[in-house]
Amino acid sequence: MTEVTILGAGGNMGRRITRTLRENPQYTLRLVEPGERGRSLIEESGLQVVDQAEGLAGTDVVVFAVPDKIVRGIAAEVIPLLESSTSVLFLDPAAVAADRVPRRDDISCFVTHPTHPPLYSLLGEEDPAARRDYWGGGLATQAIVFAVAWGDEGQAALVENLAIAMFEPVSQSYRITVDQMALLEPALTETLTNGCIAVIREGMDRVVAAGVPEEATRQFLMGHLQIGIALIFEQFDWRLSEGAQLALARSREQIFRDDWHRIFEPEAVLDSLKQITGGD
């Protein structure tokens, strides 16, 4: 049986992974949560909170389920206290990729993150509730990415299996590097994708403000979002109309800077990671 300590167990992600792991006989959980509300939520679920010293003593894996802005300080406090051969698992690449985590060669460090249920995969879910599990709260199937920051490859298999168990149901675990994960998040998803989506929402609000009925605007936009994504990501054998292709070409000139792809350059990614984890 593997002893797993979850730091930040009372937060959203901490409670999500605890719900799955508590049912798995391969793992014994030690739940660490300093916040009063978080502790109450854990206790209301029928589980017990332990203090940090008890949670860390002799544990096999420490999971950092804490916000990006404070993970740097918590890692600096916790990692020096760990026994040799302990593994640590971060649920986001930011702190590790930005070199915010103290390195100890006698422990192993890993990073994982869920893909969240892919857009068109939700259509294949039989349970109506699973079809609306956009975040990946335990109903809809999703994949994960997993990286070895440093350490023992033998430990990697154990911790990767833990990561899969955390985010079940999981279709696949993709082994990538920490730097590659940072290209996925924040660069590709949080910076580019969410930035584009936020502008789309702003565009919808402007159309409504111009007098188009809100429900008609929303329905029209949601339908065209779905077909646009399906066409551009080649979900079926069809093409954008000539008019749509012309509008798409013009959008490059009117909306996007010529150097927008600079967000993927190493220095831009590092700058974003540093901001996410509390600045310089």
Residue ranges and their predicted role:
Residues 1-48:
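NAD(P)+-binding Rossmann beta1-loop-alpha1 motif at the extreme N-terminus of oxidoreductases
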